[in-house]
């Protein structure tokens, strides 16, 4: 069975540096697993690998979308499977590197066969809700899908519409469909996660890296994006940590120092969520950030 390597970890933990070392030593090719690196024109605030780093170790699945475009976990899975096959055909080992855990989960575990959105049906559900009230729509969901109704509040119309839409299109509940997964990956997956043992070390790295981004011109990068008429804070690209806070600063919502503080706090919260995912992840080999033996540890596991 062909082998693939995953290298996960929170933001600012040293994934890219270790991945580039691996490319030099183990005939790997990198596939980025990062929901921010997919966007063009978002280089500084996403800590996109530099031109020198990309020359040493090309990354697949970066710069593949405009910031105005959407990209889902299902899109990622399809793209990643294609790239894995191309790398294996070239006689190399795919190395999947990043911190977007939903993408890793979609790739490794597969996705449920939920139906695509139906705009006409959504409009019909909204019309019914205006006539009957959202509580009555929630009562309908409780009859059709009791488990989902426990999770979804009557005041959360977006998720309520989706759950009802799935029931009406498929004749099955979202709960039933979510238990069906795609075929498992036909690969031997060797999984690693890298992070400092001390959370304070990670917090310092996050702060130092954001301040470096500011020195590299991050505010000007966001200012250029903000000039585009097709971008706004509702888009996933502009909700990336750092970008949202800088946009709000440029809108005059708060001063520069507050922006810096808010961006650093948001990045720390992201790292905390990433670590929470990783602690429950099965079959994971842990590496400590900054340890010289990490490369040899990975190579030993991959023989």
From Swiss-Prot:
**Sequence positions that bind ATP:** 9-16
Species source reads Shewanella sediminis (strain HAW-EB3)
Keywords, ordered alphabetically = ATP-binding, Magnesium, Nucleotide-binding, Transferase, tRNA processing
Family of the protein in this entry: Belongs to the IPP transferase family.
User: What Gene Ontology biological process does one annotation of this record name?
Assistant: tRNA modification
Q: What does this protein do?
A: Catalyzes the transfer of a dimethylallyl group onto the adenine at position 37 in tRNAs that read codons beginning with uridine, leading to the formation of N6-(dimethylallyl)adenosine (i(6)A).
- List the coiled-coil residues: none
Asked if the Swiss-Prot or TrEMBL record annotates the protein with the keyword Nucleus, the reply is no
The residues the record assigns to binding substrate are: 11-16
**Signal peptide: which range, if any?**
none
- UniProt keyword Isomerase present: no
Its recorded reaction(s) are: adenosine(37) in tRNA + dimethylallyl diphosphate = N(6)-dimethylallyladenosine(37) in tRNA + diphosphate
Q: Which Gene3D superfamilies match?
A: 1.10.20.140, P-loop containing nucleotide triphosphate hydrolases
E.C. designation(s): 2.5.1.75
- What's the encoding gene here? miaA1
Where along the sequence does the record put site: Interaction with substrate tRNA? Answer: 100, 122
Q: Which cysteines are joined by disulfide bonds?
A: none
Q: Which cofactor does it need?
A: Mg(2+)
Enzyme class, first EC level, given as a word: transferase
Q: Give this protein's Gene Ontology molecular function annotations.
A: ATP binding; tRNA dimethylallyltransferase activity
Per the record, which residues fall in region Interaction with substrate tRNA? 34-37, 158-162, 239-244
- State the protein's name: tRNA dimethylallyltransferase 1
What domain of life?
Bacteria
């Amino acid at each position: 069975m062909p082998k693939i390597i995953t290298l996960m970890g929170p933001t600012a933990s040293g994934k890219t540096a270790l991945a580039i070392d691996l490319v030099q030593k183990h005939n790997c090719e990198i596939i980025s697993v990062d929901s921010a690196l997919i966007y063009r024109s978002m280089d500084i605030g996403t800590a996109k690998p530099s031109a020198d780093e990309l020359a040493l170790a090309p990354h697949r699945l970066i710069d593949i979308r405009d910031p105005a475009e959407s990209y889902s976990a299902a899109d990622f899975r399809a793209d990643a499977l294609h790239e894995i096959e191309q790398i294996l055909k070239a006689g190399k080992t795919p190395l999947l590197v990043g911190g977007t855990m939903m993408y890793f989960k979609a790739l490794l575990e597969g996705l449920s066969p939920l139906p695509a959105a139906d705009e006409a049906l959504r409009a019909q559900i909204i019309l019914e809700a205006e006539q009957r009230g959202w509580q009555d729509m929630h009562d309908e969901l409780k009859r059709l899908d009791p488990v989902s109704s426990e999770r979804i509040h009557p005041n959360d119309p977006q998720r309520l519409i989706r759950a009802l839409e799935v029931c009406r299109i498929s004749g099955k509940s979202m709960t039933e469909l979510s238990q069906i997964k795609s075929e498992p990956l036909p690969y031997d997956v060797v999984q690693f996660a890298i992070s400092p043992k001390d959370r304070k070390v990670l917090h310092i790295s996050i702060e130092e890296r954001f301040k470096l981004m500011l020195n590299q011109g991050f505010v000007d990068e966001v200012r250029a994006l903000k000039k585009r008429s097709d971008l706004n804070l509702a888009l996933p690209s502009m909700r990336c940590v750092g970008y949202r806070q800088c946009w709000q600063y440029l809108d005059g919502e708060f001063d520069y120092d507050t922006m810096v503080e808010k961006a650093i706090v948001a990045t720390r919260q992201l790292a905390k969520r990433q670590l929470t995912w990783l602690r429950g992840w099965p079959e994971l080999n842990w590496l400590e950030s900054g340890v010289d033996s990490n490369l040899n540890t990975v190579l030993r596991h991959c023989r």
